[in-house]
């Protein structure tokens, strides 16, 4: 089977809509984040090389490089999310006849749950990185595509929120209270920072449209 990140839009949506549980919400979140990164790249590409934006070319080139890196990372995370979900589900098929088998199965489920929470946590972090780029691009990018920058930010925050729920659903299965507390704290900070960034970039965009 082809990597999910290599499928056409139509093929990916068909996979997402199928009865198979993966790709699911996590993969959809990663793809939304990748779309946000692509929009950020578009804004940067429509700014670079234009004489009237020469004073910010160096900055925008750096933002473009970062956006492209996040796009690649998020596409990779589409596949990683499906892989860890499938691995997690396979743990429930492990034998559970003897006490030793039951203990090994329980340990495998907990370890797989932690991986199933780690990948969407990485999706959330990467989506937040894209949101930060969008926040800068609505200021430094070509004003003719400022709304595309805003759309990048909105998609990135939506991707982060979707990833959040995919983290939370797995936390109760890890049985690692310290790890869960750190993951929850990381998410809380990301969400608070993302809300502030989105508010700011939308205010900049709305002002430009007046």
Describe every region a protein language model picked out.
Residues 2-7, 198-210:
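Accessory "access/gating" subregions that flank catalytic or transport cores
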Residues 4-23:
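Short, hydrophobic/aliphatic alpha-helical segments
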Residues 18-41, 145-163:
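Conserved phosphate/anionic-ligand binding catalytic regions in large, soluble enzymes, centered on
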Residues 42-54:
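Transmembrane signal-anchor/signal-peptide helices with a preference for the extracytoplasmic
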Residues 51-90, 197:
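A structural-propensity feature for long, helix-poor, extended segments
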Residues 67-74, 120, 127, 187-190, ...:
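Amphipathic alpha-helical coiled-coil segments
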Residues 81, 85-154, 158, 170:
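Amphipathic alpha-helical interface segments
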Residues 130-133, 145-205:
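Preference for long, well-ordered alpha-helical segments
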């Amino acid at each position: 089977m082809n990597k999910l990140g290599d499928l056409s839009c139509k093929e990916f949506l068909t996979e997402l809509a199928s009865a198979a549980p993966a790709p699911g919400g996590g993969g959809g979140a990663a793809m939304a984040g990748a779309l946000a990164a692509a929009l950020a790249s578009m804004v940067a590409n429509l700014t670079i090389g234009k004489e009237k934006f020469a004073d910010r070319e160096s900055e925008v080139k750096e933002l473009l490089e970062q956006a492209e890196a996040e796009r690649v990372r998020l596409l990779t995370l589409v596949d990683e999310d499906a892989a860890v979900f499938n691995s997690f589900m396979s743990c429930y098929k492990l034998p559970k006849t003897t006490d030793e088998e039951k203990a090994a199965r329980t340990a495998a489920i907990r370890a797989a749950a932690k991986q199933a929470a780690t990948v969407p946590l990485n999706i959330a972090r990467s989506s937040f990185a894209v949101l930060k780029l969008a926040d800068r691009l609505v200021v430094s990018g070509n004003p003719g595509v400022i709304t595309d920058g805003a759309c990048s930010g909105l998609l990135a925050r939506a991707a982060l929120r979707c990833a959040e729920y995919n983290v939370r659903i797995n936390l109760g299965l890890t049985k690692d209270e310290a790890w869960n507390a750190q993951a929850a704290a990381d998410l809380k900070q990301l969400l608070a920072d993302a809300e502030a960034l989105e508010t700011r970039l939308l205010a900049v965009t709305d002002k430009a449209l007046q």
